[in-house]
Amino acid sequence: MFDNFFSLDIPGEVISSLIVILIIMVLSIIIGIKAHFQDPLKRPRGLLLLAEEGVKFFDNFAGELAGHAMPNFGGFIMGVAVYLFIAFIFGLTGLPSPVTYMAVPLSLGLTTFLLIHFISARFTKWKYFKRYVEPFPFFLPVNLISMWAPLLSLTLRLFGNAIAGWVLLTIVEYALRDLSAMVFSFIPSDWNQIFLAPIPLAILHAYFDLFSGLIQTTVFISLSAIFIGQEVPEELSFNTLVNERR
């Protein structure tokens, strides 16, 4: 449907991803406007209340898993979580899900991967390079290979689960079409081919796009927070936590 968008050879999943980003941008603008005109003496309601609770939740979530030395890290985690969850449930519309396109999980995994090394270099300075020759210098090749483990883990885990659901849904859809054509072959029209499909496919879509999407989103942001939190010195995170509680 989207593959020839405006006569451009762009994969449908990429267009879906742009739509998801547009949805998030519109929601952000609406929340920003509501926050601007919100009376500080009154309790927020509706979308603004949801956004406020979301910010609190992801700030605490990031603090628990990644430490308290990065006060703004919860915003990154929240942004990734919102994008991923909407991207998963986007398949409920019948349009391509962005997560089933390898470039999308790879981009998310690469973002976390680069952030891991940026945080490590920021807090450890020149000692960052020492990690590649520990415990002995001849471990350099092994360490250079193992440094890619978080990128592969995050990308392949996310893409594998998304594409597995898509493959299963496709197989079930074709099987139900053939079964419907066989059972209702006496009905002279094409609609009999999808007669049995709506209810089973709706249930599977609800699982893979909604329930499984929530699980995969949670797993991805949890691993991202843990991987990044491992690069923050423990004493720095502890001192920040102590200062916050004073």
For the regions a language model picked out, list residue spans one by one.
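Selective transmembrane helix interface/packing segments
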Residues: M1-R246
